């Protein structure tokens, strides 16, 4: 089966997508931490998420994310999917399409 190529419009949309929105769609469980008070950007939020048996604490600011436990981050839904699911770009793109993102 041949995979559909990712066009620039789709890639730009995924890069600009809010990390919090992408996290909610990708993770099996995601809950915002209402007690979190950001120090740098007032728009930052902290999320507790589960993917399979793995637990994450993710800071989200617009399309950017930072995994506080694994000390890794990135920007955009593709990077987030690759990080959370330990998959490559092609599988991340297919998964994002499946989720309707």
Place the predicted regions along the sequence by residue.
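N-terminal structured subdomain of primase-like DNA metabolism proteins
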Residues: 1-101
């Amino acid at each position: 089966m041949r995979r559909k190529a990712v066009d620039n419009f789709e890639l730009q949309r995924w890069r600009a997508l809010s990390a919090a929105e992408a996290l909610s769609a990708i993770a099996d469980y995601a809950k915002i931490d209402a007690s979190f008070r950001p120090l740098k950007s007032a728009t930052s939020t902290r999320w507790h998420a589960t993917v399979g048996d793995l637990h994450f604490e993710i800071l989200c600011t617009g399309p950017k994310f930072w995994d506080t436990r694994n000390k890794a981050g990135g920007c955009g839904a593709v990077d987030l999917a690759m990080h959370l699911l330990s998959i490559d770009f092609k599988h991340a793109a297919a998964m994002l399409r499946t989720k309707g993102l």
